[in-house]
Amino acid sequence: YGREQEKIHNKNFRFTLTTNGVLLNDEIMEFANKEMGNVVLSIDGRKEVHDHMRPFRKGAGSYDLIVPKFQKFADSRNQDKYYVRGTFTHNNLDFSNDVLHLADLGFKQISVEPVVAQPTEDYAIREEDLPQLYEEYDKLAAEMVKRHKNGNDFNFFHFMIDLEGGPCVAKRLSGCGSGTEYLAVTPWGDLYPCHQFVGNEDFLLGNVDEGIKRQDICDEFKCCNVYAKEKCRNCFAKFYCSGGCAANSYNFHGDIHNAYDIGCALQKKRIECAIMIKAAEADEE
């Protein structure tokens, strides 16, 4: 259907597939390599970390099942246009070991990011965790510089930064474009600003049959930018994070024009590390 609509409307649709790997097989890999501009392979890192958060109904983990499939999948895409994507929690604050574990498995495109959860959850990241997490990012950045020198480097999504080009001004101001340039569509055809708002009727924009019915919600998201957020105005990182995630802001503060504080702190640390890596690489040249 998508390819048909491309021709009719002179558009180029790019599709992404996210998989936990359990049902992944050669047929699906072949289809994804033909049709998907990017694939996201969901794995949290070391076996004990992954299996703890992702058990089957009977308690067994999926690590041993999915790793060989993911390695094959990544190689079939020439180690490009994919990410192995993990989430670290309060249970594995030493997450740099998970990133390096994935790199040692042969993956070249890696993204491991902090869980976003309410403080009542036992796995939630807490403010007192921040000093250790800062150390982990420093440790990871130093190891990446070392591996770059040795020729066995890899990309870590949250350290990728473009100091000379990067997104346009509009993107730097407002980020992902949720509710304006970007929508989530449910299997029932309902429209929401993004997938994290799905199910919250206060953010139900409309449906695919009738279109946008709540233009007022879209207008509110249009005003969601770094200059409208008090916490962002004087922050050195505002044009790199673009104000952070509107859903996280709403879930923690009840307002899309606020900012998720732990996320802000970690984002600033990641930008510092990314700049350090750029400086280290420049010194080599």
Locate predicted features.
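Short acidic/His/Gly/Ser-rich catalytic and metal-binding motifs that mark active-site loops
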Residues: 47-51, 119-122, 244
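Generic recognition of stable, solvent-exposed alpha-helical segments in well-folded globular domains
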Residues: 27, 65-68, 97, 132-135, ...
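Amphipathic, soluble alpha/beta structural segments
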Residues: 91-98, 161-177, 228-254
